[in-house]
């Protein structure tokens, strides 16, 4: 399940950048299709993350923080695309997205189901 979760959020990250680029280039039809596929991957990421979260019986604060950071990351992904679609500035959203994404990945790798990088 861990590999499915990681694969789904990596694909979701790729789709965010593709959709952002399509919105930036003015290709609204392609961007809309990519955005809808990305929303499907949001659901897959949330479901696989919930399964990993519920796998343990003894939770601590790190598991809850990882789950919340994951949901916030998905929120930032969606805000980035909506702001780009509407032509609004997204600099602050980009900074928040990168910070929260890095925190989420580092915390995910630190937990027992993550890869032993740290």
Curated annotation (Swiss-Prot):
The chain crosses the membrane at residues 6-26, 33-53, 62-82, 89-109. It comes from the Bacteria. InterPro entries: UPF0344. GO terms for cellular component: plasma membrane. It is a multi-pass membrane protein. The keyword Transmembrane helix applies. The keyword Transmembrane applies. Keywords: Cell membrane, Membrane, Transmembrane, Transmembrane helix. It is found in: Cell membrane. Signal peptide: none annotated. HAMAP family: UPF0344 (MF_01536). NCBIfam families: PRK13673.1-5 (NF010198). Belongs to the UPF0344 family. This is UPF0344 protein BLi01172/BL01343.
């Amino acid at each position: 399940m861990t590999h499915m979760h990681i694969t789904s959020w990596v694909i979701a990250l790729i789709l965010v950048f593709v959709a952002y680029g399509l919105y930036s280039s003015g290709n609204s039809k392609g961007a809309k299709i990519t955005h809808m596929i990305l929303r499907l991957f949001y659901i897959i990421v949330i479901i696989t993350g919930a399964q990993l979260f519920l796998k343990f019986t003894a939770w601590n604060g790190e598991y809850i923080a990882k789950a919340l950071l994951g949901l916030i990351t998905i929120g930032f992904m969606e805000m980035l695309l909506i702001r780009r679609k509407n032509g609004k500035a997204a600099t602050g959203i980009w900074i928040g997205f990168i910070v929260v994404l890095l925190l989420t990945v580092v915390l995910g790798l630190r937990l027992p189901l993550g890869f032993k990088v740290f």
